[in-house]
């Protein structure tokens, strides 16, 4: 379960624009009416300048793009896949691929564990010659590795030379053991081999010609515009770009700019562009002024292209080619006249699932596109302040986790049940039943959860007697009879953590939100509270432990196996109903809920977008169970299959088919939803604190919780 998670961080700097308020209460309970391709357009939409995107598949045997450049009518790339890196060339006209001669085994290949013994850290072209910097990590003799410089003729693909770098980088203040990190061609026969403090000018045989201290500039930015080269410049604390004369090495004056002065950009058309504000901007190299070309979100065809890339090249025809970090393909972005589409305004947060849906929607819908705005534009706002902004500005879709819970009703949002019932691609039966039931409140579905998580308790497999016999008596006896010094929980699961768990499950076990009632004075709440108080906790990181509370299913398998030093079972909480586990609306500790405003003029199109987040196709890239459990069964099954993974070196981090079967059984047998409610948590926590301190009896504590919670829960119904 510790598979590398693809982490994407959005930084959308979009301003909230004001608009007139709509009508409250509109759309409740009315079945949507479809007319053609949603509710826009009459077939005579205006065409405006824009961009169209195309995905270019990598050649067979390649699974990711590592580095990329362009020369004339050829796109050149370092691709990963299989046992070796591949040096690839694509003809721009035919988009056909060929390979340059390169064998990883010449540089150490892979070791006995399957890890590559080399890497490619430099890949650039100048005057028709491609330069490649290969770092060999270790020698067969056991000594430190070497750096190698390879040169290729771009037209023929023929290898021109290869040479081992015969000198070492100079130790400096940045690193006592510096390494060569970049290779910048300065012509067909000269290049700059760089560490973090110096540029070493070398010839075609990697012989040192001259050493240039990186004072006032560095190669964090490489911008090639035709025959001109620009680099990152520094002066008196200011950062910008400087021209770099490839013959004399002279630097031009610093040109300050708000664009990001890092990354790799090449234009065969002679234009200058850089990344800025999650998009590409044209750049005036004389003034530093920029103008937006496009946002990644507007042109990206999938999540791998919707990030701050820092790598883009442009052909002489004006087409841009982009690739994210280890992208599975290359994206071509071409200027074109496009249909002027209506906007669906989404106020949200950084949510990988909803972003993926937005990208799919924007790349396929002919009449609408989603504009993704971060709520609050980077300002810390209260839920009430955000609600006031929503009422003022009236976007089409809002992230409901940012709003007061009692505002999510027919007064502000449309009921989505009629949309689900009228949709041919999804139905109520497609949802995990208890999750759908929990979303229906106050007579309708006003908040659509796209992901949930599970609260549970795992126990060492050999200690689990089965759910029927998993009682408080059994658990207390198990703890009393444990070996001396063996902890109950791992050290970071303290009393406060376990009390928070009890507060969370209480909202599902002892509260009926629809009826507005609670039952803390019935059942075994008092005994669970006493258990939280009396359980021995530890501050030492000792293993094995007896139990592990699960607040997020994504890491449950790896944590349980590590803490137990063996197998696990989902036992659930003792003396609770069903399987003792609970869905929670807070996946990865934040709610993934959205609603369509009743005032929206594009409700049908907004639903067409929102439902994409529920479909199994939305799970294809970037998401895994660490982000939560999809609320539809088909999407959940896709995630289960995606997450099956065997870690040969660290088996405890594997997620096997047996693990998938256990999780499937847990999810489909869980019956209740435990909502994250700050007020209920505050009531239970403050009353429990007095009990734990010995200032109040258990009976009085439970009585006070029941009294205070009854009033609060009744107000929410």
Predicted features and spans:
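Repeated scaffold domains used in trafficking and secretory/extracellular systems
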Residues: 62-69, 112-125, 169-186, 216-226, ...
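Helix-loop-helix "hinge/cap" segment bordering the ligand-binding cleft or interdomain interface
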Residues: 91, 128, 153, 157, ...
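Extracytoplasmic "Venus flytrap"/periplasmic binding protein-like
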Residues: 369-431, 440, 562-563
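Hinge/lid segment of periplasmic solute-binding proteins
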Residues: 403-456, 569-583
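A bilobed periplasmic-binding-protein/Venus flytrap-type ligand-binding module shared by bacterial periplasmic
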Residues: 457-462, 584-602, 621-625, 631-632
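Extracytoplasmic/periplasmic substrate-binding proteins
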Residues: 527-608
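C-terminal capping/gating helix-and-loop segments adjacent to ligand/active sites or protein-protein/ligand interfaces
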Residues: 588, 645-714
